[in-house]
């Protein structure tokens, strides 16, 4: 979704929210939470407050009028009823005959509500310097995480990684072979963004940064001499992330055409841009997801930008055997999340030994 459309959608949701949700939104902007995160949270709040009104838990006609006292006095049983509603309601925007939303969606909803309750009960200050209320019912609600062993996750993911020579092979395919699969018209469109697309994919494969971090890179953030890219991590923390040397050529090729092809000016600070009606703007995450899917499907298997991040992490661990180093590269606070990469590499090593 383009930034302009995202802002419009956020404004529509803000228009129907209670005042304290707007305060929450404004507070999180200062951290800063990304607009994408806040948009997803606002959608969850709209769903929750709509249920409060429709179920009669809140005795009001519209969600704007749901008072703080409703949230303060909400019982654990009320929240459990809401969770059951999510599990049992007909699924929307799908042809599936299944009912209810996924556990992942429910966890996301509860995470958004926990963030709001934490703000209202701990972070915000009224005129007396106290929170709006103290009772946090969200602390009584447990979430169920998706159960899957590391072996299962590794098995599911390793076929979607471009390990070893496949990393460069993927880039070479886009650079030299992909155009041969296209019609004349499609080839012309491909050439318009070829250098930019290669630079985006190379950046993620060479650094392992998140999609949201990649699209928000500015020109000043990328240093080709030190081979460092500065990004804003989750929680608003700035980080200097090294990238592998193979990406440098793709950045240089893109920079050679960026100004003329995308008609950028000094005001266009975004590194990765797109051109619409002769106006340059920052590329949006959905556009990157689509281009990664398009090229990867033609090359080997359809993947997401996050799988490119997994690719870098797995390759880096294979070279270093250091979970700490991989965690730092990915911007993780602990090494627990890197256990997956060790499992993938251990399986690869076992397969290599079996073939001796």
UniProtKB/Swiss-Prot annotation:
GO molecular-function terms, A-Z: DNA binding; tyrosine-based site-specific recombinase activity
Core-binding (CB) domain ranges (all copies): 16-121
Compartments it resides in: Cytoplasm
Family the entry assigns: Belongs to the 'phage' integrase family. XerS subfamily.
Cellular component aspect of the GO annotation: cytoplasm
Alphabetized PANTHER family for the sequence: PHAGE INTEGRASE-RELATED, TYROSINE RECOMBINASE XERC
Active site as annotated: 210, 234, 306, 309, 332, 341 (o-(3'-phospho-dna)-tyrosine intermediate)
More info: In contrast to the XerC-XerD complex present in non-streptococcaceae bacteria, XerS acts as a single recombinase required to recombine difSL recombination site.
Main location: cytoplasm
Lineage: Bacteria, Bacillati, Bacillota, Bacilli, Lactobacillales
Gene Ontology BP annotations: cell division; chromosome segregation; DNA recombination
Domain Tyr recombinase: 169-354
Keyword 4Fe-4S: no
Record-linked SUPFAM superfamilies: DNA breaking-rejoining enzymes (SSF56349)
Name of this chain's protein: Tyrosine recombinase XerS
The keyword Metal-binding appears for this protein: no
InterPro entries: CB (IPR044068), DNA_brk_join_enz (IPR011010), Integrase-like_cat_sf (IPR013762), Integrase_catalytic (IPR002104), Integrase_recombinase_N (IPR010998), Integrase_SAM-like_N (IPR004107), Recomb_XerS (IPR023670), Tyrosine_recombinase_XerCD (IPR050090)
Keywords: Cell cycle, Cell division, Chromosome partition, Cytoplasm, DNA integration, DNA recombination, DNA-binding
Cysteine-cysteine disulfides: none
Protein activity control: FtsK is required for recombination.
Function field: Site-specific tyrosine recombinase, which acts by catalyzing the cutting and rejoining of the recombining DNA molecules. Essential to convert dimers of the bacterial chromosome into monomers to permit their segregation at cell division. Binds an atypical recombination dif site (difSL). Binds preferentially to the left arm and cooperatively to the right arm of difSL.
């Amino acid at each position: 979704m383009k930034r302009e459309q995202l802002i419009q959608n956020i404004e529509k949701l803000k228009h129907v929210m209670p005042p304290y949700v707007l305060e929450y939104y404004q507070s999180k902007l200062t951290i800063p939470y990304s607009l994408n995160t806040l948009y997803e949270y606002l959608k969850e709040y709209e769903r929750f407050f709509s249920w409060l009104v429709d179920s009669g838990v809140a005795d009001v006609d519209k969600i704007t009028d749901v008072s703080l006292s409703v949230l303060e006095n909400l019982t654990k049983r009320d929240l459990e009823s809401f969770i059951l509603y999510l599990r049992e309601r007909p699924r929307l925007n799908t042809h599936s005959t299944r009912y209810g939303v996924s556990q992942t969606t429910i966890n996301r909803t509860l995470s958004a509500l926990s963030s709001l309750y934490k703000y209202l009960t701990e972070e915000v200050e009224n005129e007396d310097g106290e929170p709006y209320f103290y009772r946090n019912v969200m602390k009584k609600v447990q979430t169920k995480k998706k159960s899957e062993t590391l072996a299962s996750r590794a098995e599911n993911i390793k076929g979607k990684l471009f390990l070893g020579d496949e990393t460069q092979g993927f880039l070479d395919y886009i650079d030299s072979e992909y155009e041969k699969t296209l019609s004349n018209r499609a080839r012309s469109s491909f050439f318009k963004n070829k250098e930019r697309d290669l630079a985006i994919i190379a950046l993620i494969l060479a650094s392992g940064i998140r999609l949201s971090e990649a699209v928000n890179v500015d020109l000043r953030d990328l240093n080709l001499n030190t081979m460092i890219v500065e990004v804003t991590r989750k929680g608003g923390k700035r980080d200097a992330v090294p990238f592998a040397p193979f990406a440098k050529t793709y950045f240089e090729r893109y920079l050679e055409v960026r100004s003329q092809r995308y008609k950028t000016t000094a005001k266009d600070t975004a590194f990765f841009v797109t051109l619409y009606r002769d106006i340059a703007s920052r590329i949006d995450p959905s556009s990157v997801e689509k281009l990664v899917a398009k090229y990867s499907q033609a090359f080997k298997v359809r993947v997401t930008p996050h799988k490119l991040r997994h690719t870098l992490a797995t390759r880096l661990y294979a070279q270093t055997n250091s979970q700490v180093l991989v965690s730092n590269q990915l911007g993780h606070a602990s090494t627990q999340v890197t256990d997956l990469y060790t499992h993938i590499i251990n399986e690869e090593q076992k397969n290599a030994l079996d073939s001796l």
